[in-house]
């Protein structure tokens, strides 16, 4: 088809002889030019006939510049046989050679003689209206020989046209409906000078206005009304060839082109078999090389027009290619990743080269492949695949030179490929800002609201997404430029109400190679200048200005899928991959990696394909690529496997424990602390390593410093983020840099973790003197071998075990503690004496030490003692489903304490943990409850009815009353040294409504000096009183709803809607509670008017009250 179009152009140029009369046809022009579209003497068949109205304006004394033949006295209807270059008719871009003129200014020419028609056209006046009939363009079918592609072209108007003629469009008769087809490109016009558009291309949109379903007249009107610069989306045909894909050696490719026209190929050098070779680096979209289908990126160029490239430099090869004539002969060695192709048209001849290469295993086979193209005048794009015969010299094991494919599947002309949303990467439908419901919603609301990561919206195909922004710097390419086209409002001068979209990305351009930009992304700013509230023309001008400096900085907004991410275990992720475009993930091998350990995803490029899935996170373990296991592969092998993947990459991932959304399942507490330094130091020392995924730990605090005074930061805490910049995958040096650059206000995201120190970690943190006697219990407890990291000594994220905290069988935390040996089971969870870890994390633990039957250094209990305690203390099992709810419950409560300013409670919790009370695993001794320590008052998950009794709390391991050891004295001493003087407790209370009074037996009031809701009055013997509530208790949660910032107006409805059961989390100042006890009892007429509510005594039993004995 390309050869045909070029022949047309040459013939037109050769026919620039001056006619004797501007409207007469010379005898030498009786024969239509070779290759002209449907020039016939007879009428056009009705099913192929289209019509249009052409309006021309001419000055007095000038001619239209067209030659008309035919008439009633001639051999056919009046038709246009020639258009003079530069004439009015030619520059109008509305007429084409072969069009039939039906009427002039309403005068029907059916019965006019030839000389009468000429006379009418001469004397018609300044305004000429022609009714024209033309042959509809042929149907372009995407089938076995042709595939469709799209490209965006930006053209500047010349006069009021772009230098091409369009035909087709929608019609009332479906058989006459066609896409809008470009049938002629005027030589020397804007489209011809730009060089991309060729006759036969389909025009899909103009400045984002889709032309599908528009009539010819409507399409012409849109072209006229657009601005002086317009962006056109063009669909073109690409020939595809089996002979290239199945070639076993060098091929000779002949491509026809106009002399002086560029082939559209950029070359580079590469090394193959220790020799420098010339290869195709880039192919411009819609260029001659792209349309022919025989050349691909990566092909080796062996010769150009017979000149060998073996000893040529890159500059010489480029010059040879530029000097080629109308027939380019290239000898190529196809790249091994050449895409599957079909047959090509007759202007591309492919045959086997005689050149034998030392690395070519089929060099001795003499096989030639000839492609015959049969041209159909009605369907010039359609190619038939000829039958091929193969020489007998080919052995049965040799690959065939060509694979014939005659797939019956094809697409009609009006089922454009651009409508297959999600199939083609350059889909027009998905890029239109008005093509989806999502875009319409974004246009109705303030667009800036979508910048919030917390606001999810519905994207294409109904997928839930959230938006993110990133900055991209592009460096222009000499051939393709930046390689992006924008799509904005209907008119170029219209102010944009939403940012322009990226509607097209050119293949192998800087925009595609960066791996970040995708079609449909919103361009928020260009070189720092916001695009919103500006015009589309201004946005395009910014891009054009950037091409002068060959560099542009884009701020883009894109969609990230809200994927369902497994919190543990393994799963598969499939990512689409393009040639020369990275997936956006960086893999690394930890220095402590052992044989069989997986590789780790150490970085994910923002905006990349991997990032947009919303599934992958830093630290995830990469187990396999395309079902190739990586446990025995080096990092270099894995990178090579990743680079060799085609089209779709399948990754097998194991989730990193730190990426789990349910941190509470491991007892982790994560909260944020804001420090205002006011020019002074923070007073913290951090330690870590340069390994990306080693934790950054607070190793020491300056005495009386800013961090220590907050009461929320402690030695051994892990820093997750600094000023919202995550430290995930970052070394110690980067964390130090972030702290140095943090400014006056520093926000730290802290994690109190229960994880034991990894065996592979090379560093241990020093611990304060007051805890130096606390050992790990993992190895010999001698002082020399004791690890020094504080988190090894105690799990600092375990909920507080004072009288306010629920029992261990209610906390639902899977804990493994001490030396590996005896395993204790309760509530469906294992208490192992190795370390504290979640069940999700066990699979990734390094091999544990051999079991040792030794005593715990601080407790003095052997495995036998643990067993004896287990036999008596773990008899009552509880529901494990409630356990998971409990762990979420406590973590939220602790976070509430931090965010509401009660950092003293956190200090109390820390001190309780450091005191060693975390070893109290709620073992119940065989003796009476009143003699044993309990950590919680409310056992609401028991299948029996609640019981009301009173107990006191003990900081020792469950045992009989006589078991007092040196450990207890040590713990008490540590409590005196460590614990904060702030008296505060944390309680969880479950109440059942009084069936008689229909309330919970207490009233609430707003705080006077501090924001919050507090217990005011308590009815004696009511559910609140029996449940242990006291005046001045602060309500942190009501039925798992955080109420730290609520007032009574919001809390009272929550309590009223709770039904018969009410779950509360309260904080208590024991001193205030003791004062309230001394106050006289309330009068007997205490009523519901004090906002009283809570639990039924009809459930019977004894609900325990807590006697706070541990004031901090």
UniProtKB/Swiss-Prot annotation:
Domain of life according to the entry: Eukaryota
Biased composition range(s): Polar residues: 928-958, 1086-1099
SMART domains the UniProt entry points to: PDZ
Region span, Disordered: 752-796, 841-886, 922-963, 1077-1112
Location of this chain's protein in the cell: Cytoplasmic vesicle; Perikaryon; Cell projection, Dendrite; Cytoplasm
Sequence ranges assigned to domain PDZ in this UniProt record: 53-136, 150-238, 252-336, 471-560, 572-657, 672-754, 988-1070
Membrane topology per record: Peripheral membrane protein
One MF annotation (Gene Ontology) recorded for this entry: GTPase binding
Broad class of the protein's primary localization: cytoplasm
Gene Ontology biological process: cellular response to brain-derived neurotrophic factor stimulus; cellular response to phorbol 13-acetate 12-myristate; cerebral cortex development; dendrite arborization; nervous system development; neurotransmitter receptor transport, endosome to postsynaptic membrane; positive regulation of dendrite morphogenesis; positive regulation of neuron projection arborization
Pfam family membership, one: PDZ
List of residues that carry Phosphoserine: 43
Subunit structure: Interacts with EFNB1, EPHA7, EPHB2, EFNB3, KIF5A, KIF5C, KIF5B and the C-terminal tail of PRLHR. Forms a ternary complex with GRIA2 and CSPG4. Can form homomultimers or heteromultimers with GRIP2. Interacts with GRIA2, GRIA3, GRIPAP1/GRASP1, PPFIA1, PPFIA4, FRAS1, PLCD4, PTPRF and liprins-alpha. Interacts with ATAD1 in an ATP-dependent manner. ATAD1-catalyzed ATP hydrolysis disrupts binding to ATAD1 and to GRIA2 and leads to AMPAR complex disassembly. Interacts with SLC30A9. Interacts with BUD23.
Summary of the function given for this chain in its UniProt record: May play a role as a localized scaffold for the assembly of a multiprotein signaling complex and as mediator of the trafficking of its binding partners at specific subcellular location in neurons. Through complex formation with NSG1, GRIA2 and STX12 controls the intracellular fate of AMPAR and the endosomal sorting of the GRIA2 subunit toward recycling and membrane targeting.
Record comment regarding domains: PDZ 6 mediates interaction with the PDZ recognition motif of EFNB1 and EPHB2 and with the C-terminus of PPFIA1 and PPFIA4. PDZ 4 and PDZ 5 mediate interaction with PRLHR. PDZ 4 and PDZ 5 mediate interaction with the C-terminus of GRIA2 and GRIA3. PDZ 4, PDZ 5 and PDZ 6 mediate homomultimers. PDZ 7 mediates interaction with PDZ domain of GRASP1. PDZ 7 domain binds CSPG4. PDZ 6 mediates interaction with the C-terminus of liprins-alpha. PDZ 1, PDZ 2 and PDZ 3 mediate interaction with the PDZ-binding motif of FRAS1.
Name of the protein in its database record: Glutamate receptor-interacting protein 1
Gene: Grip1
């Amino acid at each position: 088809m390309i050869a045909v179009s070029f022949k047309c152009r040459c013939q037109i140029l050769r026919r620039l002889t001056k006619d004797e009369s501007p409207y007469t046809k010379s005898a030498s022009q009786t024969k239509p030019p070779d290759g002209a579209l449907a020039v016939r003497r007879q009428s056009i068949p009705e099913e192929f006939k289209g019509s249009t109205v052409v309006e021309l304006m001419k000055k007095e004394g000038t001619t239209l510049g067209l030659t008309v033949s035919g008439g009633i006295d001639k051999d056919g209807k009046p038709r246009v046989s020639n258009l003079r270059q530069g004439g009015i008719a030619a520059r109008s871009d509305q007429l084409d050679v072969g069009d039939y003129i039906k009427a002039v200014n309403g005068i029907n020419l059916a019965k006019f003689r030839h000389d009468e028609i000429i006379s009418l056209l001469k004397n018609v006046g300044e305004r000429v209206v022609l009714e024209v009939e033309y042959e509809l363009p042929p149907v372009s079918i995407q089938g076995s020989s042709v595939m469709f592609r799209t490209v965006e072209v930006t053209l500047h108007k010349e006069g009021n046209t772009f230098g091409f003629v369009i035909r087709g469009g929608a019609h009332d008769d479906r058989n006459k409906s066609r896409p809008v087809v470009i049938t002629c490109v005027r030589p020397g016009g804007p489209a011809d000078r730009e060089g991309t558009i060729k006759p036969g291309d389909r025009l899909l949109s103009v400045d984002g206005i889709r032309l599908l379903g528009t009539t010819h007249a409507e399409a012409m009107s849109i072209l006229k009304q657009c601005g002086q610069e317009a962006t056109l989306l063009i669909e073109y045909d690409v020939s595809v060839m089996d002979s290239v894909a199945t070639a076993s050696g060098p091929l000779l490719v002949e491509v026809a082109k106009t002399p002086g026209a560029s082939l559209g190929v950029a070359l580079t050098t590469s090394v193959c078999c220790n020799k420098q070779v010339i290869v195709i680096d880039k192919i411009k979209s819609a260029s001659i090389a792209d349309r022919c289908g025989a050349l691909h990126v990566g092909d080796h160029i062996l010769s150009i027009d017979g000149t060998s490239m073996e000893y040529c430099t890159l500059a010489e090869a480029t010059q040879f290619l530029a000097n080629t004539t109308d027939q380019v002969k290239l000898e190529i060695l196809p790249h091994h990743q050449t895409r599957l192709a079909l047959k090509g048209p007759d202007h591309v001849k492919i045959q086997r080269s005689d050149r034998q290469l030392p690395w070519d295993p089929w060099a001795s086979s003499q096989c030639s492949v000839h492609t015959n193209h049969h041209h159909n005048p009605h369907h010039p794009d359609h190619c038939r695949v000829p039958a091929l015969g193969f020489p007998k010299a080919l052995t049965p094991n040799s690959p065939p030179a060509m694979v014939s494919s005659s797939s019956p599947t094809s697409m009609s002309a009006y089922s454009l490929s651009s409508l297959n949303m999600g199939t083609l990467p350059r889909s027009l439908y998905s890029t239109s800002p008005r093509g989806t419901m999502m875009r319409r919603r974004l246009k109705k609301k303030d667009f800036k609201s979508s910048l919030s990561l917390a606001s999810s919206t519905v994207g294409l195909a109904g997928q839930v997404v959230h938006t993110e922004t990133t900055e991209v710097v592009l460096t222009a390419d000499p051939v393709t430029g930046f390689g992006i086209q924008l799509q904005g409002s209907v008119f170029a001068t219209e102010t944009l109400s939403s940012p322009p979209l990226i509607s097209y990305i050119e293949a192998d351009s800087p925009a595609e190679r960066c791996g970040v930009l995708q079609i449909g992304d919103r361009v928020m700013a260009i070189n720092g200048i916001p695009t919103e509230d500006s015009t589309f023309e201004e946005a395009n001008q910014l891009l054009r200005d950037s091409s002068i400096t060959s560099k542009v900085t884009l701020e883009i907004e894109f969609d990230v899928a809200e994927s369902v991410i497994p919190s543990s275990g393994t799963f598969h992720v499939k990512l689409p991959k393009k040639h020369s475009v990275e997936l956006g993930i960086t893999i690394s091998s930890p220095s402590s990696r052992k044989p069989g350990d997986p590789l780790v995803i150490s970085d994910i490029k923002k905006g990349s394909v991997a990032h947009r899935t919303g599934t992958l996170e830093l630290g995830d373990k990469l187990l396999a690529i395309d079902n190739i296991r990586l446990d025995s592969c080096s990092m270099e092998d894995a990178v090579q496997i990743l680079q060799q993947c085609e089209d779709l990459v399948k990754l097998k991932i194991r989730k990193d424990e730190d990426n789990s959304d349910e941190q509470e399942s491991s007892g982790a507490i994560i909260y944020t602390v804001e420090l205002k330094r006011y020019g002074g130091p923070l007073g913290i020392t951090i330690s870590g390593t340069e390994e990306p995924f080693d934790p950054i730990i607070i190793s020491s605090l300056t005495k009386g410093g800013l961090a220590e005074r907050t009461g929320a930061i402690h030695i051994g805490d892990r820093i997750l983020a600094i000023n919202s910049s995550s430290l995930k995958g970052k070394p110690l040096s980067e964390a130090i840099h972030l702290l140095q650059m943090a400014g006056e206000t520093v926000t730290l995201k802290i994690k109190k973790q229960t994880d034991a120190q990894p065996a592979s970690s090379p560093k241990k943190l020093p611990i304060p003197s007051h805890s130096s006697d606390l050992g790990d219990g993992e190895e010999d407890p001698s002082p020399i071998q004791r690890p020094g990291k504080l988190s090894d000594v105690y799990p600092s994220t375990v909920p507080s075990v004072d009288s306010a905290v629920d029992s261990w069988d209610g906390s639902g935390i899977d804990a493994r503690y001490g030396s590996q040996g005896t395993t204790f089971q309760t509530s469906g969870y294992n208490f192992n004496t190795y370390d504290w870890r979640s069940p999700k994390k066990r699979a990734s633990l390094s091999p544990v030490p051999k079991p040792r039957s030794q005593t715990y250094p601080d407790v003095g209990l052997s495995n036998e003692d643990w067993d004896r305690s287990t036999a008596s203390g773990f008899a009552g099992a509880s529901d494990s489903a409630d356990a998971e709810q409990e762990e979420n419950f406590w973590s939220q409560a602790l976070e509430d304490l931090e965010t509401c300013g009660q950092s003293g409670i956190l200090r109390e919790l820390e001190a309780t943990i450091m005191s060693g009370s975390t070893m109290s695993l709620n073992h119940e001794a065989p003796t009476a409850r009143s003699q044993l320590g309990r950590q919680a008052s409310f056992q609401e998950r028991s299948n029996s009815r609640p019981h009301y009794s009173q107990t006191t709390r003990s900081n020792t391991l469950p045992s009989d009353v006589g078991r007092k050891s040196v450990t207890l004295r040590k713990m008490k001493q540590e409590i005196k040294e460590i614990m904060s003087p702030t008296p505060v407790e944390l309680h969880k209370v479950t109440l059942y409504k009084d069936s008689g009074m229909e309330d919970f037996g207490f009233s609430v009031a707003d705080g006077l000096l501090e924001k919050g809701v507090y217990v005011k009055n308590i009815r004696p013997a009511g559910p609140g009183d029996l449940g242990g509530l006291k005046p001045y208790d602060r309500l942190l949660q009501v039925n798992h709803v955080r109420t730290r910032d609520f007032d009574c107006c919001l809390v009272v409805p929550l309590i009223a809607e709770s039904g018969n059961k009410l779950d509360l989390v309260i904080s208590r100042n024991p001193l205030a509670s003791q004062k309230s006890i001394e106050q006289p009892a309330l009068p007997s007429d205490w009523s519901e008017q004090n906002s009283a509510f809570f639990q039924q005594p009809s459930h019977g039993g004894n609900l325990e009250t807590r006697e706070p004995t541990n004031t901090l």
